[in-house]
Every structure is written in structure tokens, then in C-alpha cells.
């Protein structure tokens, strides 16, 4: 989905990129999709059309990716537990985001993850849950999500999906899980694929294969398997191994 295109009806309105979800250390796909979007907006020279909200530790990094972007910062919680972080994100999205919308003339809000606040905003919102495995795969092998976390996430996703105007699924697996567990919101889902970014020379001489890399997936169909295959495809001519 081209979020910038949603703004064409009113050029004075801006997009709020809600990046309050970014971790101190890169957390994989959850963070990368946000970075990819910001880089894309920067390359299209649309920096004046967006405002970024984040915890203060992410400010310098985001400004490096997109020089000139307007960045609004919030101080992170002093304690770093999962529950404290989740509650603080809910606080920011429930009370601070509406103020940012009014002050910066925001027309669309993009949430880079879940936990989007306890009330529906007055402007359209787009969100990416990334996956709902705490609900859909409570038990995976020897790992089991605690019952209170299961209930918390089950309610949180329901509230987020109810308030969102569009829900972005990063893969067919994510889309089918959301449709299965939250069927009433299936018409809001838009599926995309978040590409990885690897710099490889355009012309690479083939290398004779000397062995194999074996990848085993015994859990369930997941976008990470697609990412693995695509990543290997990009470097296949650089190494002397085949992927099985």
C-alpha cells in the first residue's frame, strides 16, 4: 500500500509515522519494515509530507536515514520489562498521539506495530501486527505463552483491529491467521511482503557447489521461510553451497 497516495486529496495534511515501537537494538522484521518505509519516503522526496514519533533513543538513527524529517520524541520508561513497555506504548498512543495529530495537521497515522491505544483516532489509521503468534501459536514445542499474556494480547489485538482502518499482513500466513482468529476484521486486511535489503554485486561469476545448507522448518508456514529463500537466492552465486 502506498501510504503517501492516501494524502493526495489534501496536500496540507501529513502522515504520522508512529515509530514508538522501535527497539533500542534492531529487532528484525518489526523494525525493518518501518525503516524500509521511511527510506522509501525519503527517496521519493516526500519528507515534508510526514512526521515521525519515536522514543528519544531512536531519533539520531531516524534522522540519519531521512535527513530533514520532523522527529517528535518521547522519553522511554525507566524500566525495560515487556509489560512496562507495552503499557507505556498504550499511554503514548492513547494520550500523546491525539495531541500530535492536532498540532501537526496529521491526516493519516501509520502504526509500525501493535498496541495502538485504547481509543479510535479521528483520522484514518494503518497498522501492522506482524504476527499474532501469542494468540495463534500459544504453544510451540516446549515454549508456552503464559495465560495472562495470552489474554492480554488477545484483547489488545481485538482493540487494535477494531480501531484500525487498514491492517497490513506481511505474508499469506499472517493474513490467514488474522482472518481465522479475528474474522470480523478480514475486510480490513491488505497483504504485502516486506523485502529484505542486501547489497550484492550486479555481476557475480557462478561458484562451483561443494556442499549443502539444510533448513528445517517443523513449526508452521511462516514469512521467515520466504525471507530465508529470498535471501539465499540473492547470494547464491557468491557461495559454494546449495540450499535444501
Question: Model-derived features: where do they sit?
Answer:
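Carbohydrate transferase catalytic cores enriched for Leloir-type hexosyltransferases
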Residues: 2-244
Amino acid at each position: 500500500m502506498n501510504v503517501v497516495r492516501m494524502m493526495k486529496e489534501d496536500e496540507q495534511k501529513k502522515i504520522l509515522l508512529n515509530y514508538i515501537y522501535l527497539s533500542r537494538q534492531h529487532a528484525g522484521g518489526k523494525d525493518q519494515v518501518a525503516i524500509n518505509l521511511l527510506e522509501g519516503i525519503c527517496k521519493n522526496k516526500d519528507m515534508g509530507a510526514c512526521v515521525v514519533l519515536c522514543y528519544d533513543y531512536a531519533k539520531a538513527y531516524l534522522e540519519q536515514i531521512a535527513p530533514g524529517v520532523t522527529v517528535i520524541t518521547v522519553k522511554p520508561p525507566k524500566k525495560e520489562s515487556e509489560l512496562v513497555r507495552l503499557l507505556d506504548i498504550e499511554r503514548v498512543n492513547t494520550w500523546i498521539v491525539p495531541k500530535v495529530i492536532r498540532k501537526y495537521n496529521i491526516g493519516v497515522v501509520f502504526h509500525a506495530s501493535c498496541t495502538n491505544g485504547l481509543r479510535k483516532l479521528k483520522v484514518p489509521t494503518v497498522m501492522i501486527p506482524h504476527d499474532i503468534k501469542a494468540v495463534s501459536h500459544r504453544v510451540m514445542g516446549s515454549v508456552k505463552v503464559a495465560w495472562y499474556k495470552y489474554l492480554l494480547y488477545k484483547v489488545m489485538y481485538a482493540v487494535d483491529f477494531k480501531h484500525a482502518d487498514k491492517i497490513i499482513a506481511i505474508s499469506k500466513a499472517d493474513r490467514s491467521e488474522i482472518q481465522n482468529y479475528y474474522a470480523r476484521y478480514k475486510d480490513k486486511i491488505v497483504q504485502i511482503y516486506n523485502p529484505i535489503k542486501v547489497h550484492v554485486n550486479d555481476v557475480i561469476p557462478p561458484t562451483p557447489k561443494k556442499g549443502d545448507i539444510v533448513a528445517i522448518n517443523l513449526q508452521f508456514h511462516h514469512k521467515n521461510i520466504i525471507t530465508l529463500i529470498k535471501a539465499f537466492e540473492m547470494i547464491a552465486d557468491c557461495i559454494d553451497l546449495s540450499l535444501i
